[in-house]
Amino acid sequence: MALWDRIKESASTMQTQLMARKNDLKSGAFRDASMAMCALVAAADGNIDPSERQKVAQLIMNNEVLQNFPAQDLQRRFDDNCNKLTADFDFGKVSVLQEVAKAKKKPAEARAVIQIGIIIGGADGDFDKDEQAVVREACFALDLPPHEFDL
């Protein structure tokens, strides 16, 4: 099986798992951590071009699990995290990873945040090494073993 086929299959499986837990994923910590994860993936290579930012924002709005939250609230949180990362990537990354870590107390939410990162990262057909690296860092911030997600 080609790498892209495995990524698509994995993302599809993860989306199904997220949908099964949709009603459990309504906390503010999950919301904040998810938007931080989306920003990290968007900025994985150290910058975010406007088209990439728009594409990730569109994916956020279309994700059924994230529809538990007001779209404007998600957009604002995503933009705030993106702005931190574009102002100073290294310093911003520390702050954004702290947002991700908010989901650490609830393992199901922590896993869901990682799954969202993988889904967003693989949505363009290429879950590249930079995206994998930031999702792996998020695993450490959430006290989850990266190998659980094939990272």
Regions found by a protein language model. Name each.
Residues 1-40, 50-151:
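Small-residue-enriched hydrophobic alpha-helices in membranes
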